[in-house]
């Protein structure tokens, strides 16, 4: 039968002789575990931050783009909200001065962006634009170039719009894009009336989606990837 007393005495003696090595070993294990936990936590936080920033850049959880009109989609009923945009390059004019310039016209319908916001001067410009009527939001570069003011008229195709606000920033739009072809937002309801979208026009159609928090977007769209 084992002599447990002797075993304990030997173990205690070895422990006293090698206590510094044992403490170093235990400390290494503790530090290693702590490092693994910290790295794992950092990775999760980094992934979360990247996802959040991507949403801020897109202004939505998911964006579908096509050069043809995007009809009803299977995922429409799964989304909390959707918005649509039609954008294309076109000349716009300022009737007060007769000046004109190439711009990126964006006809918007819905509450896009779902993340971030359209920053305007005055701050009420976005709300005024969405309240209805022939209102437009005009990028600051364009406003400065033609010394335009909020309340002035801008002509897009055959329709005249009152400038409701000066656009300062838009989710997903770079400074280069704004310099080459500054954006002019108009309500989708008046797009057809402008007469600018005709057969053969180079037009891009966007559909924006926002889903419930923690929705796995990749898993959600997987069954429809071949269709898109």
Protein language model regions, located:
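Membrane transport/envelope proteins' first extracytoplasmic loop
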Residues: 2-228
